[in-house]
């Protein structure tokens, strides 16, 4: 049989068994190392209501808390919800991570390290 991926689509190398987790979308069991993981950091308050809350707030330096959620997807749900795409045979060999998406008003990139 031909091999489609160098890692067989999972991160399990010397381990015999990996505990299953449930997909966030469809709740099917998928091995923890095979699941596509996505870490989402959002404001608890939606963007439209941030200004209203900050105006009404008694504390002027109050920072709104954030919501930290780790999402686990099975392969089919990750493809369906466009978290990952299927790539050509040559593009599959490219193991560099995709460019980090950073919104317009976010922190600037860190300065380069001195030699």
From Swiss-Prot:
Which residue windows does the record flag with biased composition (Basic and acidic residues)?
Answer: 87-97
PTM annotation (Phosphoserine): residues:
54
List every stretch annotated Disordered: 85-115
Ranges of biased composition (kind: Pro residues) = 98-115
Q: What residues bind Zn(2+), as annotated?
A: 23, 26, 74, 77
Molecular-function GO terms, alphabetical:
mRNA binding; structural constituent of ribosome
Q: Where in the cell is it found?
A: Cytoplasm, Cytosol; Cytoplasm; Rough endoplasmic reticulum
Tell me which Gene Ontology terms the entry assigns under biological process: translation
Among the Pfam families in the record, one is Ribosomal_S26e
Q: Which InterPro entries has this protein been placed in? A: Ribosomal_eS26, Ribosomal_eS26_CS, Ribosomal_eS26_sf
Q: Which domain of life is it from?
A: Eukaryota
Chief place of localization: cytoplasm
GO CC, alphabetical: cytosolic ribosome; cytosolic small ribosomal subunit; rough endoplasmic reticulum
Q: Which UniProt keywords apply?
A: Cytoplasm, Endoplasmic reticulum, Phosphoprotein, Ribonucleoprotein, Ribosomal protein, Zinc
Function recorded in the entry: Component of the small ribosomal subunit. The ribosome is a large ribonucleoprotein complex responsible for the synthesis of proteins in the cell.
Q: How the protein assembles, per its UniProt entry?
A: Component of the 40S small ribosomal subunit.
Similarity section: Belongs to the eukaryotic ribosomal protein eS26 family.
By its UniProt entry, which PANTHER family does this protein fall under? 40S RIBOSOMAL PROTEIN S26, SMALL RIBOSOMAL SUBUNIT PROTEIN ES26-RELATED
Its recorded name reads Small ribosomal subunit protein eS26
The organism named in the record is Oryctolagus cuniculus
């Amino acid at each position: 049989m031909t091999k489609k991926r160098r890692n067989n689509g999972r991160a399990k190398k010397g381990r015999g068994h990996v505990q299953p987790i449930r997909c966030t979308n469809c709740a099917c069991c998928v091995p923890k190392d095979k699941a596509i993981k996505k870490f989402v950091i959002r404001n608890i308050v939606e963007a439209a209501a941030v200004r209203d809350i900050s105006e009404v707030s008694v504390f002027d330096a109050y920072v709104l808390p954030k919501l930290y959620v780790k999402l686990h997807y099975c392969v089919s749900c990750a493809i369906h919800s466009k978290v990952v795409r299927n790539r050509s045979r040559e593009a599959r060999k490219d193991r560099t991570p995709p460019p980090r998406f950073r919104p317009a008003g976010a922190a600037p990139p860190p300065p380069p390290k001195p030699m």
